[in-house]
Amino acid sequence: MLTLVPTPIGNLEDISKRALKALENAEIVFCEDTRVTKKLLNLYNIPLNKTFISMHSHNEEKVIKNLNKDDLITKNCVYVSDAGMPGISDPGSKLIQFCQKENIPYTVIPGANAALTAYVASGFEGEFCFFGFLPHKGKERTQKLLKILENDKISILYESPHRIEKLINELKEYAPERIIFLAKELTKIHETFIKAKAKDIKLENTKGEWVVVIDKGNKHKKLELDYNDILNLDLPLKEKSKLLAKISDKSPKEIYNELIKT
């Protein structure tokens, strides 16, 4: 049987007795990084007399293709990501799909998750959408962020310390009045919360992993971008035309035809 086991996102005490028992009884451990998982088990004084199989985003399909179905049925198998809940911005979903397809029994142990923890800490209320990490750069990033800002639900993102300032600057440009909640180093000693309008956010120390919670937009209100701002975005003409149509009385087709003539 397969058990998906969440691991702490920072504080080692944030793990359940059930999760520890599953790790202790495991015969096969699928994990993102075997070094990280072995270190974690050592911290909990759990013996390493198990088979460890590295399974991450780059080899997930290959590992599943070579799986011994009987092992998953007859042995105690667990999957853990490096931190948090498997399957949420981490591998795990494809392994579940394999179990569903092959009628292999599985279960999921509830536990730590950065997105939900940050949402609760934000004080925002209402429906929310989780978007994981944005594309690193280029028009794909811009397109994704603009769609998120047009969303009429609360949005939750993950961002790395290397790109958090870039994201804040983008939010200042596209939605300066939007309320943003930032959570850094959740559950750790230097846990930090910041809540302010995008235009007022100042980051003094960007080190650490970030969760960004963006208050919902108003679907009847246009993004805080003017015509020239959109023209200067690194987007395909069709996407620009759609955005420009939202702040004008022209159709996307009319604007597109105008743009291709310029």
Can you annotate each of these PLM segments?
Residues 32, 55, 80, 107-109, ...:
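Structural motif
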Residues 2, 51, 76, 154, ...:
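A contiguous loop/helix-start segment that scaffolds small-molecule binding in enzyme catalytic cores
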Residues 1-57:
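Glycine-rich, flexible N-terminal cofactor/catalytic loop recognition
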Residues 23-29, 103-106, 154-155:
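Short active-site oxyanion
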Residues 64-117:
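Glycine/small-residue-rich loop that forms an oxyanion/phosphate-binding "nest" at active or ligand-binding sites
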Residues 94-151:
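Class I SAM-dependent methyltransferase SAM-binding "motif I" and its flanking Rossmann-like core
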Residues 54-61, 134-137:
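Conserved helicase motor
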Residues 35-37, 114, 163:
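Alpha-helix capping/helix-boundary segments
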